[in-house]
């Protein structure tokens, strides 16, 4: 089973000009196929946010229906032609509905799909596609620039078909994919070294042990408070990660495994600390404030806060609206 987490936030420049967020992400899991897609609407195209939304949804539906056909077809150009043609047909109909030109719906497109140990990657335009293989973070596809400086290729561009990248193969140790827009590149992609920031690996690792809604909230907070401050552009990210069946949930971990997860070692009081952390983690299954936690574990608030801060540093606990709650998955169904 593959899971997805996604985030798209309006850039500072678009907030100032009252322009909608033009980055769109989408995830679909059907027919034993999991697909993620990201599209960055062209800043020069007035309706690009509508186009970005359409192409992400349409490509995900297309790949859940045609994955095997596309994977087994040896003529890559023929597949690309069908995909681009299908997307342009959808954009043409949308342009009629919105009473605009197809070029007004221009966007890039990044896609990763998996099914039964196989993958397909598609890329038109800028943005970056990364993946994790055997625990190592790698790049599958770098940004594709246009003919002129500071330009890129869009699904609606005349050279979309000729520049479109398509990769497919066996997963063989690949456990996650990440798609990022060019706005997010400023913080999470090193152009000189052509490498992704270690934060991606951390997000993917956390997605295997953290509750999906908690990870989603933390990603959104990070994007709002950190990522988007590095650029005026919209910022988006979507990841697809294989579930870690070796993690049964925190409550089923052995004491040694819990110590390892919490980095507890070399302390004479480690057993006592672990027991206290267990108590806090269980108690915060439902949100509580500091006073409630302090009262429950019979510890003064300033010392209680230190324990909670430590658990937050390990991403086991998160804080929202003055209350704390457990972020780590306690039990798996």
Name what the model sees in each region:
Residues 1-61, 127, 159-161, 231-232, ...:
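N-terminal entry segment of metal-dependent catalytic domains or homologous docking segments
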């Amino acid at each position: 089973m593959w899971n997805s987490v996604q985030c798209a936030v309006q850039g500072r420049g678009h907030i100032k000009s009252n322009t909608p967020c033009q980055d769109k992400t989408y995830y679909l899991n059907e027919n034993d196929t999991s697909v993620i897609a990201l599209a960055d609407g062209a800043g020069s195209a007035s309706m690009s946010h509508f186009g970005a939304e359409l192409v992400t949804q349409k490509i995900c539906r297309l790949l859940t229906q045609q994955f095997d056909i596309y994977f087994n077809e040896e003529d890559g150009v023929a597949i690309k032609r069908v995909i681009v043609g299908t997307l342009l047909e959808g954009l043409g109909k949308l342009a009629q509905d919105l009473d605009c030109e197809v070029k007004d719906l221009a966007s890039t497109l990044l896609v990763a799909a998996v099914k039964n140990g196989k993958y397909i990657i598609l890329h038109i335009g800028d943005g970056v596609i990364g993946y994790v293989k055997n625990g190592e973070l790698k790049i599958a596809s770098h940004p594709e620039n246009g003919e002129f400086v500071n330009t890129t290729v869009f699904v609606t561009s005349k050279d979309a078909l000729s520049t479109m990248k398509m990769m497919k193969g066996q997963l063989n140790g690949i456990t996650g994919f990440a798609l990022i827009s060019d706005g997010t590149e400023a913080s999470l992609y090193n152009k000189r070294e052509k490498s992704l920031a270690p934060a991606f690996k951390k997000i993917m690792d956390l997605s295997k042990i953290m509750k999906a809604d908690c990870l989603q909230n933390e990603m959104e907070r990070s994007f709002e408070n950190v990522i988007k401050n590095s650029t005026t552009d919209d910022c988006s990210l979507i990841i697809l990660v294989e579930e870690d069946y070796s993690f049964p949930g925190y409550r089923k971990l052995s004491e040694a495994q819990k110590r390892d997860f919490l980095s507890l070692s070399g302390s004479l009081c480690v057993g006592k600390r672990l027991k206290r952390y267990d108590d806090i983690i269980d108690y915060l299954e439902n949100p509580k404030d500091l006073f409630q936690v302090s009262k429950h574990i019979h510890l003064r608030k300033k010392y209680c806060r230190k324990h909670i801060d430590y658990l937050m540093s390990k991403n086991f606990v998160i804080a929202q609206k003055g209350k704390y709650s457990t972020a780590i998955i306690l039990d798996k169904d």
